[in-house]
Structure formats: structure tokens, C-alpha cells
Design a protein with these regions (language model features):
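N-terminal secretory signal peptides
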Residues: 1-35
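Non-ligating segments of multi-cofactor redox enzymes
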Residues: 26, 31-95, 168-169, 201, ...
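Iron-sulfur-associated redox domains of electron-transfer enzymes in respiratory
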Residues: 36, 40-46, 59-64, 140, ...
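Short, intrinsically disordered, charge-biased short linear motifs at domain edges
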Residues: 44, 88-93, 98-100, 129-130, ...
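Short amphipathic alpha-helical interaction/hinge segments
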Residues: 51-54, 117, 121, 307, ...
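Iron-sulfur cluster-binding cysteine motifs and their immediate structural context
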Residues: 59-64, 71, 75, 80-89, ...
């Protein structure tokens, strides 16, 4: 057997190492060029890839790896290694990017995209348009080498912060406050709400507001919409939630025939965006053109969402097409990098409060970050909208819609309306099953919550890579602490009791589903099924 020695560089999420490995070269001796796929077969057979990943130090880090090696690269002398494919990432993708120099063709991105998210392989190739992608970012959580990441907007945000003419306002999503600490060595799920606000103020943001506020606003609009459909438009039942942009795009691709079931409500991020440049700008006497709106999200798809053409309600309202509702999105991971760039030790910061006008949030809004949380929050307020009474205790701790099960079902009796049947779904493979039941007229529900990522936003594609691949222990710790925030003593637990949201209606929107609310807080969708047409 012919043997040779190769000097090989192996990349991980943060480091690069080099080493000299003995490999069997017989199959390659007669070739002038070796394909990337064949090269990784060669390296895998010698144990180079697996050994190299471990040698980078991931196994000794609290975050960012734990030394995870895809099965086919474990050990050595396992020729021939089965080198797998990978998902395509277009250069125009607004959410995701790949560093080819780090890709080891392990196939984990393809695995999660196909088997968990049910996107890859659900269309015939070749297609005529860009590669279908719902931008969920789950591939970035499964990639063992850090080759797949979010497309960073840190530089744009830093530039805005350095511009004295700009007023930079930032909103933070509920799920980020139970994950950010993991990037600083804290236990998974640690609540760092006040520290996160303090860090953002230290960095130099002019105002820090809470996406929980607009989650409460979303509940006011969406629960009102459900009541309207139950009473007047039953042909649009069941109503689908629409706050997850990955799910929405999935529905546009693969469910265009049932898209009328989607709620017209924007996500909390996209509701808060136009309000910062209209309502907030007027209250603070700031020119809307000078406001830069940034959001901190657990989700890579939010980068795509803020760039959707229709997300310019503030620009339409103000007659200036250059004004976008949300200018930049940073993931939880990007925020951690920004904090470290500014040499801030998150663990030592004193808690700071959110700023007023758009800063109040209820416990109902906070549980948006967990699968089932949107449904629980919505039904609490739906009950109040119909009865004008607060919901019973059981709806404040609605166990039937909690937990990590991919599909959950529940029902609630609402006086004058009767039994309302609901379902909660996370993971797009599960969504595909639910969609088939809608088509087959076998779905008994009036209201369905959909989240693209298994477990909901707590396990979004922009969250810390605390374990590779993601595991339910970490999802559970993050989820439990969101529910702790909801049940904390003194916390309002009903979205309709958010005083700042009520002030918004009194001063600006009038009431849920009003003409002004429809302009700023509601949207429309695009049939993307034709984008899956086979290229001819």
C-alpha cells in the first residue's frame, strides 16, 4: 500500500490547527487533481477530520462546540468514508452564508434541512429560481465547524452608532434574554434581561425597548382577528399564526393553496419597527429619517423578514420610500460578539430597565419565545375580548400547550362562543403534516400556532451554539425560565393589561383592527409556489 504524509489545516468555529497525518494514497496516486469530495474521503479515512476538530479545542469550551464530530468522521481506518452532500446557500441569501474553507462535507446541514425542516428535497431539481430557503438557520446550529453562519450586520450597526446624526433604537426579543448568558459562560437558560439592556446602553444605543411590548400588541391584534373570523369569516378558519418568518415563507412555498388561513398580523419585530418611526418619533420629536431601528433576535429569518419589500409601512405612512421599518437585525450570537468587541463583561453588569413608551411587557409577551407561548398568550386575551373577564387560572398555566412535543392539541370553553379547539406545532416537518390535514378537511381546530424551529424561538437559528447538535435539555432550560418570567410576582400576565399598549391605542391606533392598525401592523403574503417550477 502506498502511503504519503499530508500537512493539513483543520478549521473549527474559532480556531485553525495544522498537523501532519499519514494517509493511504493508492487510489489517488495516478491523479493530477482530486475533487473536494474525494479529498475528504481521504482525510476521513485517516481520522484527520475528526482528530482535527477535537484538536482545535472545542471539547474544552463551554460554548461553541463540545467537540461534536459527525458519525462518519469518528475514528480512523474507516475507509471509505461516506462523504455527504450539503445545502446550497445563494450569495444573495440575506440571512445565511457559508465559508467553504471550513466545510467538511459532513452533510449535517442537509440532514436538518431535509429531515427536521422538510425543505430540502421537497421539490424537484433543477428549479428555475434561487434555491428555496426559509432562512431558519437550523443548519448553523448543526454545522460542526462553523462553516455556516448568519450573515452579519455588526459593521452596519457599529457605523450607525458612530454617526452622531443618528438616533439608534434597539429592541430585544424575549428568547434572547434566556440565551445570551451562555455566550459568557453562564448556565443554559440563565435570565439576563437587565444585563442585556445594560450592555446595549453601555455600547451606546440611544434607546433600548422591548419586543415583548409588541408581542403584547400582536396578541391584541391577533386575538381580535380570531374572534372576528369565528364570528364572521369562518371560511378562514383555522387561523394560522404569522409571527414566525420561517414558517410564513414555508407556507408561501408549500402551502399557497391554504395561505388565506394565515393571520394578517405582522410579527412583533415588524410591528415595533414602524411604530419607532411614527408614533415614537412623534412622541420624542425625532425626525424619522434620523432613526436607525435595530433588533436583537434569536432568529436568522428575521434578517430576511425585515428586508421583505412590504415591510415599509412607516415609509408609506410618511411618504418616504427610503424609510424601512427595521433597518438591521442582529442575532443573539452577533450581540455577544458586539459586547465582546466593546470589552464588556456581561456577568458583572448591574441590571438596567427598558426605556419607556415602547418598553413595557407582560408575562404573556415573554412566553412568545417558547413553542405554545403565542397560543397561551392569545387565548388569555381572546377570553377577555369575548367575556370582558380575566381568564380562569387554568389559562394562566395552560399545561396542554406547553412542552417540547412537536404537535400539541387543546381546547377551551369560551362563554358565548363555545369550545375553541387549538393546536401548537413546531418544526416544519410537523407543519407539513398539519397542512395536509387542513387540505383534507380533517383538522378540527380554529386556531393553530406554527413555529419553524423545534421548541420555538428559544432554539432559533441565531441562538448560541451551546451544544452541537442542539438538545432538548438546553431547550427545556430556556423554556422554563421564560415561564418563570411570566409567573414572577408582580408581573402582569395578560397582554391587554399592558398600559403602554393601551396608551398606543388611545393616542394613535384607536382600537385593534382599526384602519390605522391595518396600515402599520398588518401585512400580505406572496405565492412562491411558482419559484419551485422545474427549470427548462
Amino acid at each position: 500500500m502506498n502511503e504519503a504524509y499530508l500537512m493539513v489545516m483543520v478549521f473549527c468555529c474559532e480556531k485553525m490547527i495544522s498537523g501532519c497525518y499519514r494517509v493511504e494514497m493508492e487510489e489517488f496516486m495516478m491523479k493530477d487533481k482530486v475533487s473536494r469530495r474525494s479529498f475528504f474521503k481521504l482525510l476521513g479515512s485517516a481520522g484527520v477530520v475528526g482528530t482535527g476538530i477535537l484538536a482545535t479545542g472545542c471539547s474544552g469550551k463551554t460554548t461553541g462546540g463540545n467537540g461534536w464530530i459527525p458519525n462518519q468522521y469518528e475514528g480512523s481506518k474507516n475507509w471509505p468514508v461516506k462523504v455527504k452532500g450539503r445545502i446550497a446557500i445563494d450569495s444573495k441569501n440575506p440571512s445565511l452564508m457559508r465559508d467553504d474553507s471550513k466545510c467538511i462535507l459532513c452533510g449535517q446541514c442537509l440532514e436538518v434541512c431535509q429531515r427536521v425542516m422538510s425543505v430540502y428535497g421537497s421539490y424537484e431539481l433543477p428549479i428555475k429560481d434561487d434555491t428555496p430557503c426559509v432562512h431558519c438557520g437550523q443548519c448553523t446550529l448543526w454545522c460542526p465547524t462553523g462553516a455556516l453562519t448568519e450573515k452579519s450586520n455588526i459593521n452596519e450597526v457599529v457605523k450607525a452608532l458612530q454617526d452622531p446624526s443618528k438616533f439608534v433604537i434597539v429592541q430585544t426579543a424575549p428568547a434572547t434574554r434566556v440565551a445570551l448568558g451562555e455566550e459568557f459562560g453562564m448556565e443554559a437558560g440563565t435570565i439576563v434581561e437587565g444585563k442585556q439592556v445594560a450592555a446595549l446602553k453601555t455600547i451606546g444605543f440611544d434607546a433600548v425597548v422591548d419586543t415583548t411590548y409588541s408581542a403584547d400588541l400582536t396578541i391584541m391584534e391577533e386575538a381580535s382577528e380570531v374572534v372576528h373570523r369565528v364570528l364572521h369569516e369562518q371560511e378562514k378558519l383555522p387561523q394560522f399564526t404569522s409571527c414566525c418568518p420561517g414558517w410564513v415563507k414555508f407556507c408561501e412555498y408549500f402551502g399557497s393553496d391554504i395561505m388565506q388561513h394565515l393571520s394578517s398580523c405582522k410579527s412583533p419585530q415588524q410591528m415595533l419597527g414602524p411604530l419607532t418611526k411614527t408614533y415614537y418619533a412623534k412622541k420624542k420629536s425625532i425626525s424619522p429619517k434620523d432613526i436607525v431601528s435595530v433588533s436583537i433576535m434569536p432568529c436568522t429569518a428575521k434578517k430576511y423578514e425585515c428586508n421583505r419589500p412590504e415591510m415599509n409601512a412607516a415609509g408609506v405612512e410618511l411618504g418616504d420610500p427610503t424609510i424601512r421599518d427595521v433597518d438591521y437585525v442582529l442575532t443573539t450570537r452577533e450581540l455577544a460578539r458586539l459586547i465582546k468587541m466593546n470589552q464588556i463583561d456581561l456577568t458583572k453588569l448591574e441590571d438596567a430597565p427598558y426605556d419607556s413608551i415602547l418598553g413595557e411587557g407582560t408575562g404573556a409577551g415573554k412566553i412568545f419565545g417558547a413553542t405554545g407561548g403565542v397560543m397561551e398568550a392569545a387565548v388569555r386575551t381572546l377570553y377577555w375580548l369575548v367575556t370582558k373577564q380575566d381568564p380562569p387560572e387554568g389559562l394562566l398555566n395552560w399545561q396542554a400547550v406547553r412542552g417540547l412535543a412537536g404537535v400539541k392539541e387543546a381546547s377551551v370553553n369560551v362563554p358565548t362562543v363555545g369550545e375553541v379547539k387549538v393546536a401548537v406545532c413546531s418544526g416544519l416537518r410537523n407543519a407539513r403534516i398539519i397542512m395536509e390535514r387542513i387540505r383534507n378537511k380533517t383538522a378540527p381546530w380554529q386556531f393553530i400556532e406554527f413555529m419553524a424551529c423545534p421548541g420555538g424561538c428559544i432554539a432559533g437559528g441565531g441562538q448560541p451554539r451551546t451544544s452541537l447538535p442542539p438538545n432538548d435539555d438546553i431547550r427545556t432550560q430556556r423554556m422554563q425560565n421564560l415561564y418563570k418570567l411570566d409567573s414572577k410576582k408582580g408581573v402582569k400576565r395578560l397582554s391587554h393589561k399592558n398600559q403602554e399598549v393601551q396608551d398606543l391605542y388611545d393616542d394613535y391606533l384607536e382600537k385593534p383592527l382599526s384602519e390605522q392598525a391595518e396600515k402599520l401592523l398588518h401585512t400580505h403574503y406572496t405565492d412562491r409556489s411558482q419559484q419551485l417550477t422545474i427549470k427548462k
